[in-house]
A protein has these predicted regions:
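Bacterial Sec-dependent N-terminal signal peptides
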Residues: 1-30
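Membrane-proximal, proline-rich intrinsically disordered regions
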Residues: 19-72, 106, 110, 459, ...
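Short, compositionally biased low-complexity segments
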Residues: 19-29, 76-84, 139-146, 395-410
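Residue-level signal for alpha-helical context at structural boundaries
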Residues: 63, 70-71, 150, 187, ...
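Short coil/turn segments at secondary-structure boundaries
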Residues: 64-68, 291-293, 446-455
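Structured, solvent-exposed acidic/aromatic patches
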Residues: 76-384, 423-432, 437
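C-terminal functional modules
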Residues: 377, 381-525
Length: 525
């Protein structure tokens, strides 16, 4: 791992959003400042935050060809690299690590140093929170990662185990919340905060909601710790994100959404077959907000009342043009200005699961579940939520690829889940409903849905059709799914002893078939 400290110039900020050599985003940042004003109004520390927040998310390689594919939101019509690539479980691109360390962790440490030297405690706490926001995503890709020892000048940099990492996160969230609680009316962040306009009380809700997210994530691996931390999040007087007006969003700062570029400018991504199966089968009113109809009516002849068509992930593809008539994302994504990091719908679904697990204060599972669906429909401006929640018969549909020969790329739906809540159902079926709806609500924010799928097995997604996994990166048995991304090559060659230590902490080979600690192979209840 490169140990050099980034020297960032606050007068000229670039959000490093390039994901391939061809992907460039022009970001016009309204929060940039000039040299003359750097020492005024906190500019010398605050000017970094737009870049920090902007680099929490990945783009084409980090999301579209990893989490977005593995969570089965989007699929490619393009047979990249001869059709043998990430989407078929042969890993060719693995770059989220670099984004988090080069573009988030390094500058965040610089900001914390400046803030601590100037006794700007709120700015320091803010940067520490952003580090957790980013690294808590990265760990779901790889497992053990470098956190406590980041910035070390030792020849070997050791990784944090997942268990240690979550304990550190929770301790630091305590410290961050204490700073925020002591400074609720602080206004210094306002001009640099495109998420909450400097409202510290809303950042406090995010701290609690993030704590709840992490507690739910480790609820199978460390149930006692998860319960303690989840109940702490629920009980905190600052509250949780339970209104869409409090959703934590991250501005694109004048740039284009990566998914819009890939879909509309490159023509390289489409609706997944999994999304077609669930959205069409459940008669979901959000389908027209997420996607636009296919341009060839013949491809949706099996359900003409829902004119949408997806591509199976890991599909056997011959030519790109075969599937480009399938459903693109909605045109509205061209003008989107921000994206959700953590929203009310997710919080309600987490509370629903917490209620199933008996966590104090979580409330009623049914009410939370329905509130999660309602929050998602409202956030997307979709209609028909009441009839949707009352539907006890509609189920995900089987998939047919009309552009392939015979049954190539087809699948029979593994899921028979319905939407309507039934208190008489088992906790397992209730959990399937909760996670299925959490997945549907989490569209184009794939990190947590991919984590949920590996943790719970829900929703019951189709397997990839073409599995090209091999001994190069690990073999995924037929009928199973990828478990993680391997450690990056730069670490394998530049921090070999650190990787050996990390692999021990991983508890299995450094390949895509090794389960992560937060997603053990055990019953959900």
């Amino acid at each position: 791992m490169k140990k050099s400290i980034f020297l960032l110039m606050a007068a000229f900020l670039l959000i490093t959003n390039a994901c391939t050599d061809q992907f460039e985003e022009a970001n016009t940042n309204p929060y940039e400042v000039s040299d003359e004003s750097l020492q005024q109004d906190f500019n010398h520390v605050g000017a970094y935050y737009s870049s920090l927040l902007g680099n929490i998310f990945g783009h084409q390689i980090e999301e579209n060809l990893v989490a977005e594919s593995f969570a089965d939101y989007m699929a490619t019509p393009t047979p990249f690299a001869g059709g043998v690539n990430n989407t078929t479980y042969y890993i060719r691109w693995n770059t989220y690590w670099d984004r988090i360390y080069k573009d988030l962790m390094a500058p965040a440490n610089q900001v914390i140093k400046i803030a601590d030297e100037g006794n700007y405690t709120v700015f320091s706490a803010w940067a520490k929170l952003i580090k957790i926001m980013g690294v808590s995503r990265l760990t779901t890709y790889h497992g053990p990662v470098i956190y406590s020892n980041y910035g070390s000048t030792e020849s070997t940099i050791k990784y944090d185990s997942e268990a240690d990492l979550y304990n550190t996160f929770f301790t630091q969230l305590d410290e961050i919340q204490a700073v925020f609680a002591a400074n609720k009316t602080y206004a210094g962040m306002k001009k640099f905060d495109a998420s909450y306009s400097g409202d510290v009380t809303k950042w406090m809700k995010l701290v609690n909601s993030l704590r709840l997210r992490l507690a739910i994530r480790i609820s199978k691996a460390a149930p006692a710790l998860a319960k303690t931390q989840g109940e702490k999040a629920i009980a905190d007087a600052a509250g949780l994100i339970t209104s869409n007006s409090d959703n934590m969003t991250i501005s694109l700062y004048g740039g284009k959404l990566y998914l819009s570029v890939i879909c509309f400018e490159w023509d390289d991504t489409r609706m997944s077959a999994g999304m077609e199966s669930f959205l069409v089968g459940l008669k979901d009113g959000r389908i027209g907000k997420y996607f636009q109809p296919a341009t060839d009516a013949a491809v949706y002849s099996d359900h003409p009342e829902f004119p949408y068509k997806g591509i199976r992930n890991g599909a056997s593809l011959v030519a790109k043009d075969d599937h480009t008539s399938f459903s693109k994302i909605n045109e509205s994504f061209k003008t989107i200005t921000k994206r959700n990091y953590l929203d009310a719908a997710e919080v309600y679904f987490d509370l629903a699961e917490a209620a199933l697990r008996g966590w104090t204060g979580a409330g009623d599972a049914k009410t939370n579940y329905e509130n999660g669906v309602k929050a998602s429909f409202a956030d997307w401006g979709a209609s028909g939520v009441d009839s949707y929640l009352a539907d006890a018969t509609s189920k995900p549909i089987d998939y047919n690829d009309p552009k392939s020969t015979g049954s190539v790329n087809d699948f029979v739906s593994r899921s028979t889940v319905t939407v309507k809540w039934n208190d008489a159902d088992s906790n397992e079926l209730k959990l399937e409903k909760i996670i299925t709806q959490k997945w549907l609500a989490g569209f184009y924010n794939p990190n947590e849905p991919w984590a949920d799928f590996r943790r719970t097995g829900y929703p019951k997604l189709p397997t990839v059709y073409k599995n090209d996994s091999s001994s190069d990166w690990g073999v995924i048995p037929q009928g199973e799914w990828i478990k993680r991304m391997p450690f990056v090559n730069a670490e394998r060659t530049g921090n070999t002893a650190g990787i050996a230590d990390a692999t021990t902490k991983l508890g299995g080979p450094d390949n895509i078939a090794t389960r992560l600690w937060f997603a053990p192979d055990k019953a959900n209840f």
